């Protein structure tokens, strides 16, 4: 397994305030890491640092040579007054052919959206188009900023299953950002809890019981947490439960 990117003792300081404080982590190929933390914890700054958009104040970042990073932002801001099709939007990503656009959309099961109006896409459709754009360059590392934001439960389930299939198809690492453990992918290899520094890390179930996580998120976590375990041989209703009566795992609640 190849180490794609390593942060060692990274700090980012704005106006004498440590937004990122002594963070060390490694991202390996074919692994999924989920970064969680409350608003203002430094998640966006850490993502910018990984993408190379934010220079660390101190510490070191090592990247695999010719590392290709695909990025899916939390939300796309478009000028509503300017008409833009999905095809036109994908053209902005670089010199790729229409066939390459179609192939990328097919990977995310959205080829039917090629000529659709970007302004009229649902939250789930927008995420798939953004994901297709990121896949055009065949990334080694896929960075997803709050991918489930604004997507309904069924859409989240489908999106996570799609991310899992992409991980295997490209043998790429996935670094995913979330504000909480709610519906964290069951296939996540590691959860990192950030509050400017790394409070704790580990499997989702172990993080939910960690004293530092509990201290950070408080008792409200009991109503918020559910770990989604995807089964491939059935359909889901809108609640995310199997709709065909098959025997499979229910969503698993996290306990204290």
From Swiss-Prot:
It catalyses: Zn(2+)(out) + ATP(in) + H2O(in) = Zn(2+)(in) + ADP(in) + phosphate(in) + H(+)(in). Residues 5-220 form the ABC transporter domain. Pfam families: ABC_tran (PF00005). Its EC number is 7.2.2.20. Keywords: ATP-binding, Cell inner membrane, Cell membrane, Ion transport, Membrane, Nucleotide-binding, Translocase, Transport, Zinc, Zinc transport. SUPFAM superfamilies: P-loop containing nucleoside triphosphate hydrolases (SSF52540). GO terms for biological process: response to zinc ion. InterPro entries: AAA+_ATPase, ABC_transporter-like_ATP-bd, ABC_transporter-like_CS, Metal_Ion_Import_ABC, P-loop_NTPase. PROSITE patterns: ABC_TRANSPORTER_1 (PS00211), ABC_TRANSPORTER_2 (PS50893), ZNUC (PS51298). Residues 232-256 are annotated as: Disordered. Its main location: membrane. SMART domains: AAA. GO terms for molecular function: ABC-type zinc transporter activity; ATP binding; ATP hydrolysis activity. GO terms for cellular component: plasma membrane. It is found in: Cell inner membrane. It is a peripheral membrane protein. ATP binds at residues 37-44. The complex is composed of two ATP-binding proteins (ZnuC), two transmembrane proteins (ZnuB) and a solute-binding protein (ZnuA). Belongs to the ABC transporter superfamily. Zinc importer (TC 3.A.1.15.5) family. Part of the ABC transporter complex ZnuABC involved in zinc import. Responsible for energy coupling to the transport system. This is Zinc import ATP-binding protein ZnuC 1. It comes from Aliivibrio fischeri (strain ATCC 700601 / ES114). The gene is znuC1.
